Amino acid sequence: MKKVLFSLIFLIFLIVACGETTGEKPVNKGLAGFAVEFAEDFDLGSPEHRIENPEGGIVTTINITALGYDKKPLTDYSGEVEIGMLYGENSAVSRITMQNGYAGNIEVKMRYCLDNDRVVVQEVKKHEGEETYEPTGKIGVSPVFYTEVATISAIQGTVKGAKGAPSAFNNRNLTLKDKEMVVIAVIEGGFYLHEVGAEDYSSVYMYTYSTPYVDDNKEESMSLPVGTLIESANGSVFEFFGFTEMSFPTFHPVYVNKNGKKELKIDTSLIPAPKDVGDILTDNDEMEKHEASLVTVKNVSVAWFNEEDSSYIEYSQFPLETSDGKSIMAQTLYTAPLFNAVAEKPEEGKTPHHYNFTGILKQHTSARPSTWILVPRDMDDIECLDCK
């Protein structure tokens, strides 16, 4: 009997010792996260008053404090942390060692920041016998700061130098606004948007998957007209084989009031004249400046191609050749289907036709012999110079 009683008392002691009868929750100890503060003189900006975003990045300093679960400084903490950005990139020192729960006056150089961003600090550790650092899940973020809003020229003109010159804002969701923008072409699957007044990197493809429609005070929606002014557009920046696009966008046209009804504001005079790219076809850096823009190549003829090749069978892509031997691909299947590229192939004893080809400049890094592709808007963009 004494043994049973002793066992019962011992069991009760264990239960009490484990806290199961007290209603108390286990107490978390150690590092919970970090407080990240900017230098006192750093201007966070606001949605109404945005700070400048210089080409070399926004340079300032931060202070990092380790915090416990009680949200108080954890002065006995030592460890390694990495300093990055929520969206952009920190090009200053990215990994430091914290001692006594604090690291102060740490320089950050914040690049590729648009609209708003934050500095992110996370703890990292190396597993025994390994060289790579892994995050532990303990993080901290700075207050939000507001930089210049996204523009087409910023998205297209800020690149990271890899094949196809991808945008530095790849995979970011951004809103284009505060610039005058006009629709320069509507092609099945999307439309091309131009930033009025921008000379280079001025246009981008808005991939809508299907023909873009708008509601212009009519009973049924209508296809987005060329020349429509766009007030703002939101979408995710995506690199499709080197071609920068904004995927599945929402967009807001500019409307005007006419006789008590709202109508789309259309101004085709804002569509820029096509850029002659004949002299820069082999200069990828220069061609990048005109991606998704209206361009033209003059006095070209259809070069020989294998009509059984998948690039022609599946995508109707064929090469054009200039008088000095430069190449650019063309695609006419959807927009100018009456152009018979096969009939224009060079043959022995046959005099080739010469054309001025105008259209939208696309890029596909697997296309050959050129990764650049010219897509006419319609048959009017193909001018034969010597057809009878």
Model-identified regions with their sequence ranges:
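Positively charged n-region of N-terminal signal peptides that target proteins for export
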Residues: 1-4, 19
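OB-fold nucleic-acid-binding modules
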Residues: 24-27, 35-54, 134-388
